[in-house]
Amino acid sequence: MQKSRPSSPVRPLSPFLVGAGALLDATFPGAKPDGMTHVSAGSLRAARRAAGAVVAAIDGVFAHAGKETSHAAFCLVRPPGHHAMVDGWDKVAGGNGFCFLNNVGIGAAHAIAAHGKRVAIVDFDVHHGNGTE
């Protein structure tokens, strides 16, 4: 079992990012850490790498589909992303729940677009569905 691997940034034209691209470009250069979510020069790069790890994990699972051994993935990435909204940057909280890009939403959109599969998202924290509902 491979426990860790480096990730590549998610491509800017990933299905889930198409609508958010202009927002990201406009938000990050001038964002100030005045909300709960702190932003630095490397925040967007880190968020894209975290989302890229999720996309790579999904591709890895599908690469093993139908083989004798099953394959699963768990992505423990920073910054978190499961609460990020596609429609904006919260002026008080910043990236909404300390999240910039919704890794789960990006991964689900990738699974549908690249592998033609339906996706179920099970969000079991206290803010269930926040960012993917």
Provide a role label for each language-model segment.
Residues M1-E133:
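HDAC/HDAC-like amidohydrolase catalytic core signature
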